[in-house]
Amino acid sequence: MIGKLKGIIDSYGEDYVILDVQGVGYQVHCASRTLQALPSPGEAATLSIETYVREDQIKLFGFRTDTEREWFRLLQTVQSVGAKVALAVLSTLPPHDLANAIALRDKAAVARTPGVGPKVAERIVTELKDKVPALSAVDPAVVKLSGAIDDNRAPRAVTDAISALVNLGYGQPQAAAAVATASRTAGEDAETAQLIKLGLKELSK
């Protein structure tokens, strides 16, 4: 099984890259975010690889990090989610944002993925909510905030700040994560305006 490839970028296709490794061109399918982050043809690149072997074909999937590859595997443990859908999800949400979306039970964020309807998004959030911490990609502050929101215990300033950031165009997971960090910095008595200001600062990093 191929676990990693290091070579020279030969060319790009719609959803794949041809990686030249010592004269052999490997066609590696990647999420759009991964393809966008790779260098120009002629430059060196390294990809973590997931190898799929079928009766009629061998298919390679490439990732910039091992964490991204682990998410690819984890997503496919969900009913109705195959390799194509898993790549689409990772094209829409990077691992950290996906982890936060699941922790916050934000089905809408996952459902923004092309080809993922409300039912599949709900399955992803429901079936993976207990597995997310194992990947250590989710912010503990977001998990705590998620529980507070679910139990209607979150301060009004926190929920108002999240709504304000969402209205500014940020996704729910990003907004919640930023406000969670802001709340941890400013303290439990922070006002909405302060949380928004600190949240925007966090989002600009």
Curated annotation (Swiss-Prot):
Gene: ruvA
Taxon lineage: Bacteria, Pseudomonadati, Pseudomonadota, Alphaproteobacteria, Hyphomicrobiales
Compartment(s) where it occurs, according to its Swiss-Prot or TrEMBL record: Cytoplasm
Keyword Cytoplasm set for record: yes
Domain of life: Bacteria
Gene Ontology MF annotations: ATP binding; four-way junction DNA binding; four-way junction helicase activity
Principal location: cytoplasm
Protein name, per record: Holliday junction branch migration complex subunit RuvA
Role noted for this protein: The RuvA-RuvB-RuvC complex processes Holliday junction (HJ) DNA during genetic recombination and DNA repair, while the RuvA-RuvB complex plays an important role in the rescue of blocked DNA replication forks via replication fork reversal (RFR). RuvA specifically binds to HJ cruciform DNA, conferring on it an open structure. The RuvB hexamer acts as an ATP-dependent pump, pulling dsDNA into and through the RuvAB complex. HJ branch migration allows RuvC to scan DNA until it finds its consensus sequence, where it cleaves and resolves the cruciform DNA.
Alphabetical UniProt keywords: Cytoplasm, DNA damage, DNA recombination, DNA repair, DNA-binding
Provenance organism: Rhodopseudomonas palustris (strain TIE-1)
This protein's record includes keyword Transmembrane helix: no
Chain positions covered by the region annotation Domain I: 1-64
Any one GO CC term of the record: Holliday junction helicase complex
Entry text on domains: Has three domains with a flexible linker between the domains II and III and assumes an 'L' shape. Domain III is highly mobile and contacts RuvB.
A UniProt-annotated Pfam family: RuvA_N
Annotated region (Domain II), positions in chain: 65-143
InterPro entries: DNA_helicase_Holl-junc_RuvA_I, NA-bd_OB-fold, RuvA, RuvA_2-like, RuvA_C, RuvA_C_sf
Quaternary structure note: Homotetramer. Forms an RuvA(8)-RuvB(12)-Holliday junction (HJ) complex. HJ DNA is sandwiched between 2 RuvA tetramers; dsDNA enters through RuvA and exits via RuvB. An RuvB hexamer assembles on each DNA strand where it exits the tetramer. Each RuvB hexamer is contacted by two RuvA subunits (via domain III) on 2 adjacent RuvB subunits; this complex drives branch migration. In the full resolvosome a probable DNA-RuvA(4)-RuvB(12)-RuvC(2) complex forms which resolves the HJ.
Region (Domain III): 154-205
GO biological process, one term: DNA repair
Similarity comment: family membership: Belongs to the RuvA family.
Flexible linker: annotated span: 144-154
